[in-house]
Amino acid sequence: KYLDLLAAGKASAATAMVDPGVNNDQRTFLTDDVMASATSLLVVEDVVADKNDDSDTRTVTATMQVNGERFTHAFRVTADDATMGVLDNWKIRDSLAVPVTVDGDGIGQFSVGETKASIDKASFYVEGRSFLFYPGAYNFTPVAPNEYVDTTPVSVSVLDDVRTRNNDGKSDVTFKATYNDKLEAAALEAAQTLVESCGTYPGNQGDDCSSLIRGDSVTAISIKEKPTSLDSYSFDPTSFSGSVTYTVTTGEGALFPGTRDVGLTVKVDARFDDDGVLKVTADGKPDFRVSFAF
C-alpha cells in the first residue's frame, strides 16, 4: 500500500502512513504537487517478505525502478496491535523519503515544480542544506537572484539514494551562478562613470581618483582615451579591468610641470553578500567597487 501511494504520486498520504521522522523544514518537497512535477515516478516490480513468520520484526524487500534505474530496498516492519484482536497489523519503521543535499555558489534559492526553498546554511563550515524527496526523477531549477545571472536546471534521480550529473563529492546538487553579458555591460558603465568623473577639474580631486591625476599642482585634465570594453582578470568572471589615458597639465609646485599623458587601469569588482550572492543597488544595478591601478 505504501509503495502504491508513492507510485501514484500521493506524497501526503504516504507521509501520513509512514512518518519520515524529520523537522518540517526538511519536508518542503514531500508534497503531491512536487511529485506531480516529476518526469518519472516509482515503478514497483516485486515485494517479498522474509520467512520469519513467527517474528514480531520482519524484513520486506521491494524491487523498484525510477526512470529505468532498478534498485532494491529492505524495509523493517514490526507487529502492531491487532484490529479487534484478530487482524494482524504491521508498522513500517523506515520511510522511503531520501535526503538530497543542495548547495549553491552565487545561488540562494531553487525550485522543484512550483515549490521553492532557500539554500541557507547553518554555518560557513556546513556544505549545503538537506531536503527530503520521495523516489522520482525531478528537475532542480536554480532561481536567478537577478537579471545578471543565468540558470540551468539539474536533472536529479532519487532512488534510495541520489543520482545526479554534477555530483561534486560534497553536495548531491551544487548550483553555480553563470554571469551573463549584462554584468559586463553594467561593469563598463560603472567604469566609464568613474573615468568621466575623474576626467574633469575639479572632479579629479575626488577620493576615488588616482593620486597620479589629482593634487594641488594639477591645473587641467581631460580624457584622451577611455575604455570601450573590459576584460576579466584573475580568472574571475565578476572582476573586470580596462585601460584609460588622461591628459594632465600640472603647474607650479609639480616635479615636472607641463602637459603629459597618464595611463591607468580602471578595475571593477562585483560585491557579494554573506551567502555569496551578487549584491545589487536599490535601482537593481550590480553593486561594484570601482578603483584605479597603475
Give residue ranges: language-model regions.
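Exposed beta-sheet edge and beta->alpha loop/turn motif
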Residues: 50-127, 240-294
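Short, aromatic-enriched amphipathic alpha-helices that serve as compact interaction elements
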Residues: 1-17, 182-199
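Cystatin/cathelin-like cysteine-protease inhibitor module
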Residues: 173-178, 184-294
